[in-house]
Amino acid sequence: MTMKMMVHIYFVSLSLLLLLFHSYAIDIENEITEFFNKMRDTLPAKDSKWLNPACMFGGTMNDMATLGEPFSAKCPPIEDSLLSHRYKDYVVKWERLEKNRRRQVSNKRVKHGDLWIANYTSKFSNRRYLCTVTTKNGDCVQGIVRSHIKKPPSCIPKTYELGTHDKYGIDLYCGILYAKHYNNITWYKDNKEINIDDIKYSQTGKELIIHNPELEDSGRYDCYVHYDDVRIKNDIVVSRCKILTVIPSQDHRFKLILDPKINVTIGEPANITCTAVSTSLLIDDVLIEWENPSGWLIGFDFDVYSVLTSRGGITEATLYFENVTEEYIGNTYKCRGHNYYFEKTLTTTVVLE
C-alpha cells in the first residue's frame, strides 16, 4: 500500500468519525429538547398559559430565601447544565406571574440579568416569576422561578484537631445563600475585626483561612457580607457565625467489638451491632461498614440493611435482617471499622438458635 493510499484512507476514516460524532451530538441535543418539552407538558395550567409557544421551555426552579436578607435567582435554562452551553450572548427579561396577568419586573429587582430582591420579606414567598432568555440570533427559552422561606441558620460548631491539616490551616466558610452579588466580606473573632494580613489570616472568596493553628484560635467567628443596592444608601449586611473549638492532637486508635455469631430463628427478624470505641472521646472519626459474603457493602436496602449511629466517641453499625430465611444460615458478614489512621475488621456468622 502506497503512502498516498494510506493518507487517503486516514482522511476518509477521520471524516466518517467526525460525521458519526456530529450525528451523535445532534441526537443528544434533540433528546434534551424533548426532555424539556415533556416537562412543559406537565406544568399546571396556571403556569403553562403564560409560556410563549415560539420559545423553548427551560425548566423551573424552587429557590430558598431567608427573611430580611437578599435573594437572587438565575433564569433556570442559564443555570441548567443541560442547556447553559446553548446560550452565550443573550438578554434576560423577568416578569411576575399573577392570577390573570403578568407584570414586568422593575430594573431595581434585576442585577446582572438575575432576579434580585434586596430585602426578602414574607410577601415574596411563593411568588412566581417568568424569565425569557433571548439570544442575538432571536432564539428564546423560558423558565419559571419560585421562592420559599428558609429559616436562618444558627451558629455552626466546628472542631479542629491540631496536627491534622496544620500545613493548610483551618478554613471557615461563610455560609451565605446568595454570594454571587456581594461586595465584600469582613470577618470578626469574638467581636473584634480580623486583620487579613496573609500571614495569620488570609481570605479566599467566602473562606477565611487561619494559618499556623493553635489552641488560642478557638472562639466565635462572624462573617459580615456587604451587598450594594441602588435604593439604599448604606450597604445591606448579612451575617453568619461559626463556633470554632481547637483541640490538642488526639489518639485515633479504637477498639472494634462484634459477637462472632448471630443467633437467628427462621421466619423472624434479627440484628447484630458492631461497635467501635475510640480511645479519645472528643472525636467521632471512625466509620463502620458492613460487607456481605460476596464482599459488597451493605447499605439501606431491603431484606438486609445497615444503620450507622455515632455519639461521644462510640460508633455503632447495626446489621438488620427483616426476615431470616434458610439461605442466610452459615453466611459470614464482615464489619470493617476505619478512620484516616487505622483499619480493623471482624466477622460474624449466621447460626440457628
From Swiss-Prot:
Record: glycosylation sites: N119, N184, N263, N271, N323
Induction conditions: Expressed in the early phase of the viral replicative cycle.
Keyword Signal: yes
Principal subcellular localization: secreted
Disulfide bonds: C75-C131, C174-C223, C274-C335
Keywords from the named record: Disulfide bond, Early protein, Glycoprotein, Host-virus interaction, Immunoglobulin domain, Inhibition of host innate immune response by virus, Inhibition of host interferon signaling pathway by virus, Interferon antiviral system evasion, Repeat, Secreted, Signal, Viral immunoevasion
Signal sequence region: 1-21
KW Secreted (keyword) present: yes
Residue ranges annotated for the Ig-like V-type domain, each copy included: 248-347
Annotated compartments: Secreted
Recorded GO CC terms: extracellular region
SUPFAM superfamilies in the cross-refs: Immunoglobulin
Ig-like C2-type domain mapped to chain residues: 67-139, 157-239
GO biological process, one term: symbiont-mediated suppression of host innate immune response
Subunit comment: Interacts with host IFNA1.
UniProt family annotation: Belongs to the interleukin-1 receptor family.
Function: Counteracts the antiviral effects of host IFN-alpha/beta and key IFN-inducible proteins involved in viral RNA degradation suxh as host OAS1. Acts as a soluble IFN-alpha receptor and thus inhibits the interaction between host IFN-alpha and its receptor.
UniProt name for this protein: Soluble interferon alpha/beta receptor OPG204
Species name: Vaccinia virus (strain Copenhagen)
